[in-house]
Amino acid sequence: YGMTSTDLGDTALCYQLTQACDLLIAAVRRCAAICKRRAFEERDTLCVGRTHGIHAEPMTFGMKFGSWAWEFKRDLDRLKDARKNVAYGAISGAVGTYSSIDPFVEEYVCEKLGLVHDPLSTQVISRDHHAYLAGVLATVAATCERIVTEMRALQKTDTLEAEEPFRKGQKGSSAMPHKRNPITAEKICGLSRVVKAN
């Protein structure tokens, strides 16, 4: 008696979300570092600057990578904030009054899981914590989609300013094995749309 299924479920979900955030933070940090490194490596590599997909003024690939690194840095800051915002736990009984469970249980469990106890939860942890994280995840997905959409455009046969790696033995098409399709970029675009839709 005392602990509700929501006490367990909400607290476990928030713990899982913090662990997922840790993985995402590490991945976004790597993406930012790679883009930053490439920005310096490509700082003198001229390319066509475009607006609305049309040739505009010259720029460098370094500038593109620098722009992406900065965007990932902002995403990293947002993810860290969202992780803090979702790191809550509540083990306070049926309506949040601790009438049948000692507050020490909540404090102990939250401390062990690296969570903060939600000071005014009722039966459930407020969903604004989850919604904020979902919004940040959509923003990170939008960053990824923006980058790979540009990379896909730069890989077109008539442009060919950039291309994905093509492994030995890899086939671009079952009917035309010589093709070098931007498969990774296409997958990232598709997955980012799934994230943004949810």
Language-model segments: what does each one mean?
Residues G2-L13, V95, E145-R146:
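Conserved phosphate/anionic-ligand binding catalytic regions in large, soluble enzymes, centered on
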Residues M3, A39, R43, L113, ...:
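Short, small-residue-rich loop/turn micro-motifs
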Residues L8-A56, V116-H129:
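Long, non-coiled-coil amphipathic alpha-helical linker/lever segments
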Residues A26-R29, E57-N198:
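Internal glycine-rich alpha/beta core junctions
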